[in-house]
Each structure stands twice: as C-alpha cells, then as structure tokens.
C-alpha cells in the first residue's frame, strides 16, 4: 500500500478499522525487525534548533550542513512528487523533516510512506532552510521507534471533548499545546515556590500520608486499613500537626509540598486529592505569614508570566500592590453597607440572612460562626484582587492562637483572590492546655453530628507539652495558584489526572 492512498482512505474508516489496519502494519514490521528499537540516540531538541538556527538565512545555513539527530511524534505528513515532508513534535516543540530518494534509500522511503500520524520516529540528517524560510532537517536516515496503533484527534479540531481530555490526558497532551504549556507552567510554579522557601532558609521535609488520627483541618478523611497492624488509617487531610511536631523538635523553619486528601464533593475548585504547600516558622506570627504568602504568590507570577499584574477570565488582577486586609465584618459591610452592627450581632437575623444567600447554617451556633457563614454567602465571591480576611472566630479556628486584644477571635487569616480562597494561616496555638480544651470542644461537636470536626490527638498534645515556640504557619493551595496564574477556570485543567467517575 502506498502512502498516497492510505491517508486518503484512513479518515473514511471507523476507529476500529484504523486500529486493525495499523496492527497489520505492526505485524509486518515485527516479521522484518525489532518493532520497538531502543538504540536511537538523539542529540537535539526542536526548540533548541529553532532558537539557534531559526533566524539564520538560507544562504548562510545551507553550506554549514549542521548535523542533527532528532526524535519525536509525527504530527503532519505529506508528499510532493518524489519528496516527502513530515512534522515531528518533541517535548519542546516541532520541526519539519524532508525526505527524497536522493537523501535516503528507496527502502527507507518506502517504509516511511507506510508510517502513520502519531508514530514515533528518530531522524538523522542536516539542517537547511526551505524556500519559504522554514528550518528543516534534510533526512539521511529515519527509523520507526514506536508504532501508534490508535489515530490522533483531528489536527484542526483537536481533542475538544472535555471529559475525554481528563480521562485520556495522554492524548490531550499530544494534541493540545495549551495543555502541555499549562503543566510545564505548573512545574515552574512549584519550582518557584520551592526556590523561594529555600531562599528564606526553610527546610523541605516529608511527613506521613497515612495518619492514625485525622487532623490538621476540618474535613472528612478517606479511611483505609493496615492489615499487618490491624488498625484503621486515614489519608491525610493536612500535614499541619506533624510539621508543628518538627518545630517542637527544633526544626524552626519547615515546609512541605505534597498531596492531601478530603473525602468530599468535587467541583470546579475541589478535587478529592490536591496539592498544597504548608510552612511553619518558629518565633513568627500571622503577620509574617501573610507577608510570606504575598511574596510567594507574587514571585511565582513573575516567574511564569514575567509580571505580577495578570488577567484572569478577562479581568485584571493586581498581584503587585500590597494585598488588602479586612476583618470578616469589614468585608461584609464593604459589599453590604446597609447591614448594621446590631444586625450582624443578632444570631436569629444572621441565620435568616445566611439562608437568604443560599448558604447552609454552620454546625456551631456561635455568633462568629454565623458571621463567617454570612461572609461566605455575601462577600467572599466579590473579593477579586487579593485580600486577606483576618481575625477569625475561635470556634472555627481550633488550632489558631487566640487574640490578646480581641475577645473570641484568633490571629488567623485567609487569602482570597478572584473570589475564592487561596491560602489559610495563623499564629499557632502553643498552649497545650488550651489546645486540649479545643480538641475536647471539637470532639463534642463531632458527637453532636459534625462529621468534619477534629479528633482528640493526645500525641500532639504531648509534643506541645515539651514546648512549641511562638510559631506562624500557612498553607497555600497549589492547584488554585496554578489556576490563577494560567487563567484557567476549573481545577481539572491543572491536575494531570483528576478524579473521574468510572467509565
């Protein structure tokens, strides 16, 4: 079968017929040689060649006959008389190949003409410029390294079905340059965060992913079982209590970038497993943590976007200016100036207003919890530019240090950008007796039906009894940070393999 009739007929076949045809080709190759060789050694990448030689003129480049060995996936292929062109794609970009019967043997050319889009090839040759000025490899030898048995998505339509993008991320990455760039940026963002922390003299650590007691946040855990020990274990909902144990042990600045797991609903902002950074610094407080969070985010934006003034969903976001700071009540009043102080301290009025804004009533009946629920319904979504909401109520902050000057409040903040939470931090509670009482209060809430309330962690109390220095701590959601800095609206677009219902 010649290359001329195969591209004309394959698109008319259904997928199963195409796969069968390609399997037949693979079987023919197997009869002649190793179908999956592993001895081709490339020495060049497409983007590096484009950067080094792309601006050199044809008359200057052609005489140099620069030798290259390059490999990648064949994305385009066409014949023009006795010559054939192909475009291959590697991790850095694309480059064109040129073959004719003067440069390669007829046997090699015949083999190439039977290959398909999606096949992975290795080519050796020299660089030249076409008459249109396109940097091209004049091929002297080319080999099939891996056969693609399934057809790629249409080159014009790409992979447009969202669910298929998430289920078959490998195809999405092949077909969509935007997706590849997103995950390259994600890696760069994480590296930027890590470099910043190291520059601040923090030590990167790893703490357990399976906990005997779920803790560090108010959320439902995933439960598993350890057969040898015959005990239940919980996938961590947060690393906080282990990291603070390390501060007790004298590791005064620690951070961890890793996964946490919460057995809760999925949405455009929530995936059951997600990546976050948590960091803790001895002899620090929530003021220092707010500045750290601000600097980390600003630095990451500059690293991947070249600026801290970005656009999200068509609207500007100012990450360059100092982040605004508001209390919960100040934020409520900013967007609802008609509310009075009397109303905002009336439990029954708050409950009615919370329901009116479509929020659920909190398990804890305290005024602070009700004010927070109202904030979430009437103000949170309006915080577009970065805003720290500070001084959270004690009843919803079981691990935060109580304020010395504001009764019933803690030295806690949450950072909101584009209407959603991005970070959470506080001056850590370091009084073991106070912490024990708060754990008991959480247990009472759990007994009363609050599934997300914390357990009593006796070992953490024991660690605190050795003395936890004054400490500040903070957690930043990496997935949401990537969404912000890549202008993407759903968390599934920034997680390589998001959780999906079974097919």
From Swiss-Prot:
Name of the top EC class for this enzyme: ligase
Pfam families: tRNA-synt_2, tRNA_anti-codon
Family matches, as InterPro entries: Aa-tRNA-synt_II, aa-tRNA-synth_II, aa-tRNA-synth_II/BPL/LPL, Lys-tRNA-ligase_II, Lys-tRNA-ligase_II_N, Lys-tRNA-synth_II_C, NA-bd_OB-fold, NA-bd_OB_tRNA
Domain of life according to the entry: Bacteria
Compartment(s) where it occurs, according to its Swiss-Prot or TrEMBL record: Cytoplasm
Note on how the cofactor is bound: Binds 3 Mg(2+) ions per subunit.
Protein residues bound to Mg(2+) 1: 414, 421
Single GO MF annotation: ATP binding
Official protein name in the record: Lysine--tRNA ligase
């Amino acid at each position: 079968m010649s290359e001329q009739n195969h591209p004309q007929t394959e698109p008319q076949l259904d997928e199963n017929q195409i796969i069968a045809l390609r399997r037949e080709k693979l079987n023919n190759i197997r009869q002649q040689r190793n179908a999956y060789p592993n001895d081709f050694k490339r020495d060049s990448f497409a983007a590096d060649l484009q950067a080094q030689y792309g601006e050199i003129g044809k008359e200057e480049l052609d005489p140099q006959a620069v030798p290259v060995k390059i490999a990648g996936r064949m994305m385009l292929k066409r014949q023009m008389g006795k010559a054939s062109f192909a475009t291959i794609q590697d991790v850095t970009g694309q480059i064109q190949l040129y073959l004719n019967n003067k440069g390669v043997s007829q046997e090699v050319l015949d083999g190439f003409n039977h290959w398909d889009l999606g096949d992975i090839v290795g080519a050796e040759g020299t660089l030249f410029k076409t008459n249109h000025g396109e940097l091209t490899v004049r091929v002297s030898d080319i080999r099939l390294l891996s056969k693609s048995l399934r057809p790629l998505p249409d080159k014009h339509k790409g992979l447009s079905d969202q669910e298929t993008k998430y289920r078959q991320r490998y195809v999405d990455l092949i077909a969509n340059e935007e997706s590849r760039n997103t995950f390259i940026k994600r890696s760069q963002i994480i590296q930027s965060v890590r470099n910043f922390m190291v520059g601040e003299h923090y030590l990167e650590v790893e703490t357990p992913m399976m906990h005997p007691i779920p803790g560090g946040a108010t959320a439902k855990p995933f439960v598993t079982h350890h057969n040898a020990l015959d005990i239940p274990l919980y996938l961590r909902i947060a690393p906080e209590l282990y990291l603070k144990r390390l501060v007790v042990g004298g590791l005064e600045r620690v951070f961890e970038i890793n996964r946490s797991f919460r057995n809760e609903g999925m949405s455009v902002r929530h995936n059951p497993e997600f990546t976050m950074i948590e960091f803790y610094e001895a002899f620090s407080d929530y003021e220092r943590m707010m500045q750290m969070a601000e600097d980390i985010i600003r630095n990451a934006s500059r690293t991947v976007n070249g600026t801290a003034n970005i656009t999200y969903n068509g609207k500007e976001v100012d990450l360059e200016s100092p982040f605004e700071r508001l209390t919960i009540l100040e934020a409520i009043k900013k967007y609802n100036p008609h509310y009075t102080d009397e109303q905002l301290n009336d439990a029954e009025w708050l409950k009615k207003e919370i329901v009116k804004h479509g929020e659920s009533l909190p398990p804890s009946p305290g005024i602070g919890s009700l004010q927070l629920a109202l904030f979430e319904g009437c103000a949170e979504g309006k915080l577009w530019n970065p805003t720290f909401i500070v001084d959270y109520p004690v009843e919803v902050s079981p691990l935060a240090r109580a304020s010395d000057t504001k009764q019933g409040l803690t030295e806690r903040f949450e950072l909101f950008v584009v209407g959603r939470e991005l970070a959470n931090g506080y001056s850590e509670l370091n009084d073991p007796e106070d912490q024990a009482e708060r754990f008991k209060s959480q247990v009472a809430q759990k007994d009363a039906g609050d599934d997300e309330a914390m357990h009593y962690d006796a070992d953490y109390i024991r660690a605190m009894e050795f003395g936890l220095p004054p400490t500040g701590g903070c957690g930043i959601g990496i997935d949401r940070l990537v969404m912000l800095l890549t202008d993407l609206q759903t968390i599934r677009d920034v997680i390589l393999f998001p959780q999906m219902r079974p097919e």
